Design a protein with these regions (language model features):
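N-terminal, positively charged regions that mediate nucleic acid binding
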Residues: 1-57
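Internal helix-turn-beta structural module
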Residues: 9, 81, 278-337
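A short glycine/serine-rich beta->alpha loop
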Residues: 9-14, 115-127, 195-199, 254-260, ...
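Glycine-rich anion/phosphate-binding loop at the beta-strand->alpha-helix junction
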Residues: 13-19, 179-181, 186-295
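Alpha-helical support elements that line or immediately flank enzyme active sites
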Residues: 19-31, 125-151, 203-211, 267-278, ...
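Glycine-rich, N-terminal phosphate-binding loop and its surrounding beta-alpha-beta segment
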Residues: 42-100, 104-106
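Short acidic, glycine/tyrosine-flanked loop/strand segments centered on an H-E-D-like triad
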Residues: 96-121, 288-304
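Glycine-rich, mobile lid/loop segments that gate access to catalytic sites or pores
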Residues: 110-201, 205
Length: 337
């Protein structure tokens, strides 16, 4: 399925090297002012070709809005937007030679060889432009209700920190110069979500958020709060004791990342996602020619990110914006939306 959400539905379509890609955002409250300049700022944060740390593919990603906005305000109808693909180099791809760790083989099996896999087709990170657009709309709705979203890179390869630093950039550039790529971790913090947002089981915040984060190409791990670090602790260390502060129930610590039982507790929501090293690398790899059914080797050509993290920061923020707004529309917090 290409649609996410229950009360706020986000549908994304298109292929990396097709004429264009698009998104439909259905369920935005009517009467919400949308600053398109602010939307374009978010789009530029994700756009390729901005530095040596990213792919040199150049796309303007200026949205052609088809419906849902009139005089800068949401109408209550679905907001639909299209983005043209202007800088695709399809000659770089040979569909008969399977690219290791891409969707080439699995999509060929799933769709009987009919899928357009040039540049990754519908599996490409190119389509995250649509998610950023949707998230930019949701973000403005949330910010007017006091919800703030901010993400930063906290790991690239062996380098760590609170944001993209010199050591992390060196890891990326070293990988690129070696014809290779490197993995990363991004942390996102969402503040201002009231207690009581979320639900049971599949409607819980972890379930909702993990679902949309795993739709971002390259994401291989998601954790909340201390995440896997909780496995090393005892309950007395991991629990977040409650206290009263100015007449409000608050937690002394936030090891759970702002969620108890799938429902927000009023503390900052903290989530991290791990991104695999970009699968497209210029080093020789073993693979198979699916037409001749012979083993062969491949060096992936084309223009690719040596690390997914720099451009994935706004994508993660956008995903959280869509997920949080959907959950707030599906809870007692709807009164504040």
């Amino acid at each position: 399925m290409n649609t996410y959400g229950e009360y706020l539905k986000v549908t994304i379509f298109g292929e990396s090297h097709g004429p264009g890609i698009g998104v439909v955002v259905d369920g935005l409250p009517a009467g919400e002012a949308i600053d398109l300049d602010a939307v374009r700022i978010q789009m530029r944060r994700r756009a390729p070709g901005s530095s040596d740390l990213t792919t040199h593919r150049s796309e303007t990603d200026d949205p052609l809005i088809m419906s849902g906005l009139y005089r800068g305000v949401t109408t209550g109808a679905p907001v639909a937007a299209l983005f043209q693909n202007r800088d695709a180099h399809s000659s770089d791809y040979h569909p008969e030679v399977l690219r290791p760790s891409h969707a080439d083989y699995t999509a060929t099996v799933k769709f009987g060889g009919y899928a357009d896999l040039r540049g990754g087709g519908p599996f490409s990170g190119r389509l995250t432009a649509c998610m950023v657009f949707a998230g930019a709309l949701c973000r403005q709705v949330l910010e007017r209700r006091g919800v703030q979203i901010a993400a930063n890179v906290v790991r690239v390869g062996h380098a760590t920190g609170k944001e993209l630093n010199f050591e992390m950039k060196r890891e990326i550039l070293d990988a690129r110069s070696a014809g290779d790529s490197v993995g990363s971790v991004i942390e996102c913090v969402v503040t201002g979500i009231p207690a009581g947002v979320g639900g049971l089981m599949f409607g819980g915040m972890e379930s909702r958020i993990a679902s949309i984060l795993y739709a971002i190409p390259g994401v291989k791990g998601v954790e909340f709060g201390l995440g896997f670090g909780l496995a090393e602790l005892r309950g007395s260390e991991a629990n977040d004791p409650f206290v009263l502060k100015n007449g409000q129930v608050v937690a002394e610590t936030n090891n759970a990342g702002g969620i108890n039982g799938g429902i927000t507790n009023g503390m900052p929501l903290v989530v991290r996602m791990a991104l695999r090293p970009t699968a497209s690398i210029a080093r020789e790899q073993h693979t198979v020619n699916i037409q001749t059914m012979e083993e062969t080797t491949l060096r992936v050509t084309g223009r690719h990110d040596p690390c997914l993290a720099p451009r994935a920061i706004p994508v993660m923020e956008a995903a959280l914006a869509c997920s949080v707004l959907d959950a707030m529309l599906d809870s007692a917090a709807v009164a504040s939306v």
